[in-house]
């Protein structure tokens, strides 16, 4: 025997699916005669909504999605872990979308997620980290937000009004600079990232501001913005060490870069932190696994994911969470920083 669906009920009653939903969920007035007709058909067929029908009735699927640019970068799985644990505790299942840094793939996922009728989206990296996001990409995200709530993590779309959860990366970068200054460093460099990304430039600007308070600055030749991977950090650190007057300390855009910088420094026969200090950013699990253990800035990555889900859950349930949730960074001192060598 063929199962009766909500569509069959609507067809037999000659009404829309949404009208059947309103009757079942009692969410809005329905003419008494229409309600009686629908209820009579439901009783006749002994209709019991399945999961799909319940989602139509409630307009919820119990599924949320997270879009991120690089699952191999240790920062993003840590955020995902916090988000997934919180989501499962709230009864959601999770849809992971890894874009591999491809903006077109971001658009494809947005289209798929709308078709899947997920209840909401957490968005990391990609277009929301661009210093200037192209109008079409910004508009696409804003249009999507009219159909389902979206929470941005460590990023922004200017004038979009979208909810944000982020760590104050500028404050974290200033902490890194202050830590090195307290150890007597005056020759400081910055390695990693990309100039078109706000997550890079907010750190560079914060470091420069802190140094200028002490009458110092990072010259252009010591700002090597060459990517986010371990290999990128290794390559850019090698360039620094080839300079006539290498720095005594290096601030890296993330822990991956810092690990690459450590590898290069050791290959050059230098000692860390005796000859040069290196500080990372993020406090991923790799930071305490490398030798020497990495001094770094914690972004509270697990909490970023958890808080993002909490905000999204409140939006899904018609709540009014604050527009911005800001987490404070923390300096984690380990073995890779020490007094200046000169």
For the regions a language model picked out, list residue spans one by one.
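Alpha-helical structural signal in soluble globular domains
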Residues: 41, 82, 86, 140-144, ...
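Hinge/beta->alpha junction and helix N-cap segments in small-molecule ligand-binding domains
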Residues: 69-78, 96-105, 125-131, 155, ...
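Alpha-helical recognition/docking segments in bacterial nutrient-uptake
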Residues: 1-5, 59-178, 182, 242
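N-terminal helix-turn-helix DNA-binding module of bacterial transcription factors
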Residues: 1-60, 205, 341
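Conserved functional loop/turn residues at catalytic and ligand-binding sites
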Residues: 5-8, 14, 24, 46, ...
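Flexible loop/turn connectors
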Residues: 236-342
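Residues that mark the start of a beta-strand
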Residues: 63, 185-187, 248-249
């Amino acid at each position: 025997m063929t199962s009766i669906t909500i569509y069959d009920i609507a067809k037999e009653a000659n009404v829309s699916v949404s009208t059947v939903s309103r009757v079942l969920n009692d969410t809005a007035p329905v003419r008494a005669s229409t309600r009686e007709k629908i209820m009579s058909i439901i009783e006749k067929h002994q209709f019991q909504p399945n999961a799909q029908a319940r989602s139509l009735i409630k307009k919820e699927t119990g599924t949320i999605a997270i879009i991120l640019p690089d699952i191999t970068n240790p920062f993003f799985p840590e955020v995902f872990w916090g988000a997934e644990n919180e989501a499962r505790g709230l009864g959601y299942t999770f849809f992971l979308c890894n874009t591999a840094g491809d903006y077109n793939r971001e658009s494809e996922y947005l289209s798929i997620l709308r078709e899947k009728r997920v209840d909401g989206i957490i968005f990391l990296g990609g277009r929301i980290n661009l210093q200037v996001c192209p109008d079409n990409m910004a508009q696409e995200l804003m249009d999507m937000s009219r159909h389902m709530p979206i929470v941005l993590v460590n990023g922004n779309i200017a004038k979009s009004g979208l909810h944000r959860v982020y760590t104050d990366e500028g404050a974290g970068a200033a902490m890194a600079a202050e830590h090195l200054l307290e150890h007597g460093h005056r020759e400081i460099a910055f390695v990693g990232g990309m100039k078109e990304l706000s997550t890079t430039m907010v750190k560079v600007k914060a470091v420069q501001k802190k140094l200028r308070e002490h009458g110092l600055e990072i010259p252009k030749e010591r700002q090597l913005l060459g990517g986010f991977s371990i290999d990128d950090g290794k390559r850019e650190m090698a360039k620094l060490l080839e300079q006539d007057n290498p720095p005594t300390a290096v601030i890296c855009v993330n822990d991956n870069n810092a690990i690459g910088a450590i590898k290069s420094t050791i290959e050059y026969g230098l000692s860390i932190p005796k000859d040069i200090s290196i500080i990372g950013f993020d406090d991923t699990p790799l930071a305490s696994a490398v030798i020497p253990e990495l001094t770094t800035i914690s972004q509270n990555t697990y909490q970023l994911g958890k808080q993002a889900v909490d905000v999204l859950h409140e939006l899904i349930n018609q709540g009014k969470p604050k527009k911005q949730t800001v987490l404070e960074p923390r300096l984690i001192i380990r073995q890779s920083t020490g007094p200046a060598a000169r």
